[in-house]
From Swiss-Prot:
Carboxylate--CoA ligase that may use 4-coumarate as substrate. Follows a two-step reaction mechanism, wherein the carboxylate substrate first undergoes adenylation by ATP, followed by a thioesterification in the presence of CoA to yield the final CoA thioester. The gene is 4CL1. Residues 335-402 are annotated as: SBD2. SUPFAM superfamilies: Acetyl-CoA synthetase-like. (E)-4-coumaroyl-AMP binds at residues 242, 246, 312, 334-335, 339, 347, 440, 444. ATP binds at residues 192-196, 200, 334-335, 339, 423, 438, 529. CoA binds at residues 263, 446-447. PROSITE patterns: AMP_BINDING (PS00455). This is 4-coumarate--CoA ligase 1. Pathway: Phytoalexin biosynthesis; 3,4',5-trihydroxystilbene biosynthesis; 3,4',5-trihydroxystilbene from trans-4-coumarate: step 1/2.
């Protein structure tokens, strides 16, 4: 029976899920929670390596993760220490993450395609003591590792001075140290720019991730219904919280199989779906777009897929319709997340065990065991249904805060526990959430975050640039791409290509600036804030160089 979804609390209008609250075992460490029902699916496939079809059973994954915990401990990793996982999707990513959880240690995940400077910045900020990576990426941390006595573990070949991952697996799992993990201890430290500024470490706790996974897959009528006969396609990078949480951790909790793809390749992707009878496809809009546009799709039987979920960026109605035609038996819907929110705030109720009707373009309904409100960004007053305002969420799933940044934490989470998302949306009469705009400054390139402030800091470092602002430009393939408005220094003749080259040498591919517009001044408010609205309006009006 749907519960009452709207209440008033000290003047605030609060929205809750149509699904009733459930018991969540928040006292359990994350690994204990994920493997709580292990005996039911010990011998079932847990990880399927798409590269070589190697299958790891649940028993093997649990045992290997404990061995890795002991191996990490022998290399000096103690409770509350941080390891950096610098890997594409692979079984070792899973063993390392779960192994660290067993120790009460913290995993910070970084994109292996980051530049050396970006990797080192995160390793330093997170105080990582070990980096787990592939040989081809080890060079990115080589100098930093030597200077800071950092151990580098490689999962494939072993460059000089590195340790092979197999050494961790040779440990005796019975030697695992006895650690007392508290629910509020941090287990994952992804980096996010939040609503503004430079990337910051987001402290996600055991209790927070347990709560978030439970909100999705636990309960008699689970919001995201999955079971041990399901096969999930894990093509989204596990270093991204959406994949780590809604694919890996949710699947482990229910005993489903996880088909791991290192990277998205449409032909291999389409071959793997019928080969392994994939049933659940968690995607992002660029993958949905590739499926909708690929002529190859019609050559493959995709009838095994029963759920297609899209997140990380909004999906337009046309794209929804186009992809629906490609998956004849699938329910298609969206979720809405933000790293700081743990990450899932809303999930499509068409995915529930007892599904609800949903509207096209909605990004779900607030998850159970949580509260949502919509506030006027100027006054902070809560707003009724159908009125757009800033989306705020409260619940045990949200982050503990930003690492070593109490000011940014206080700007994001109110004293009453409300997390401000920086996204503008409204809740309609059927409790469905629609995103209409972003207060926050982030650019979303194919679902990846690009922080304008990070690119602006690099641009302003160039001697021929006196000021700069970066804003998103709409792009059919990527959703948004970063473009720069640049003020040349006196006498400078720097060109668009020179600016683009200067940036592309310092950042990962998706942060590269796609267009440069030279301007006399960057518009700013009296307090010095860049007026990005004005720059976006100039783009929309068709600015010319």
């Amino acid at each position: 029976m749907p519960m009452d979804t709207e209440t008033k609390q000290s003047g605030d209008l609060i929205f809750r899920s149509k699904l009733p609250d459930i018991y969540i075992p928040k006292h359990l460490p994350l690994h204990s929670y994920c493997f709580e029902n292990l005996s039911e699916f010990n011998s079932r496939p847990c990880l399927i390596d798409g590269a070589n079809d190697r299958i790891y059973t649940y028993a093997e994954v649990e045992l290997t993760s404990r061995k890795v915990a002991v191996g990490l401990n022998k290399l000096g990793i103690q409770q509350k220490d941080t390891i950096m996982i610098l890997l594409p999707n692979c079984p070792e990513f899973v063993f390392a993450f779960i192994g660290a959880s067993y120790l009460g240690a913290i995993s910070t995940m970084a994109n292996p395609l980051f530049t050396p400077a970006e990797v080192v910045k995160q390793a330093k900020a997170s105080s990582a003591k070990i980096v787990i990576t592939q040989a081809c990426f080890a060079g990115k941390v080589k100098d930093y590792a030597i200077e800071n006595d950092l151990k580098v573990i490689c999962v494939d070949s072993v460059p000089e001075g590195c340790v092979h991952f197999s050494e961790l697996i040779q440990s005796d799992e019975h030697e695992i140290p006895d650690v007392k993990i508290q629910p509020d201890d941090v287990v994952a430290l992804p980096y996010s720019s939040g609503t503004t500024g430079l990337p910051k470490g987001v402290m996600l706790t055991h209790k927070g991730l347990v709560t978030s996974v439970a909100q999705q897959v636990d309960g008699e009528n689970a919001n995201l219904y999955m079971h041990s006969d399901d096969v999930l396609m894990c093509v989204l990078p596990l270093f991204h919280i959406y994949s780590l949480n809604s694919v890996l951790l949710c699947a482990l909790r229910v005993g489903a199989a996880i088909l791991i793809m290192q990277k998205f390749d449409i032909a291999q992707f389409l071959e793997l779906i019928p080969k392994h009878k994939v049933t659940i496809g968690p995607f992002v809009p660029p993958i949905v777009l590739a499926i909708a546009k690929s002529p190859l799709v019609d050559n493959y039987d995709l009838s095994s897929v029963r759920t297609v979920m899209s997140g990380a960026a909004p999906l337009g109605k046309e794209l929804e319709d186009a992809v629906r035609a490609k998956f004849p038996n699938a329910k298609l819907g969206q979720g809405y997340g933000m790293t700081e929110a743990g990450p899932v705030l809303a999930m499509c109720l068409a995915f529930a065990k007892e599904p609800f009707d949903i509207k096209s373009g909605a990004c779900g309904t607030v998850v159970r065991n949580a509260e949502m409100k919509i506030v006027d960004p100027d006054t902070g007053c809560s707003l009724p249904r159908n009125q757009p305002g800033e989306i705020c969420i409260r619940g045990d799933q949200i982050m503990k805060g930003y690492l070593n940044d109490p000011e940014a934490t206080a700007r994001t989470i109110e004293k009453e526990g409300w997390l401000h998302t920086g996204d503008i949306g409204f809740i309609d009469d059927d409790d469905e959430l629609f995103i209409v705009d972003r207060l926050k400054e982030l650019i979303k390139y194919k679902g990846f975050q690009v922080a304008p402030a990070e690119l602006e800091a690099l641009l302003i470092n160039h001697p021929d640039i006196s000021d700069a602002a970066v804003v998103p430009m709409i792009d059919e393939q990527a959703g948004e791409v970063p473009v720069a408005f640049v003020v040349r220094s006196n006498g400078s003749t720097i060109t668009e290509d020179e600016v683009k080259d200067f940036i592309s040498k310092q950042v990962i591919f998706y942060k590269r600036i796609k267009r440069v517009f030279f301007v006399e001044t960057v518009p700013k408010s009296p307090s010095g804030k860049i007026l990005r609205k004005d720059l976006r309006a100039r783009l929309a009006a068709g600015i010319s160089n």
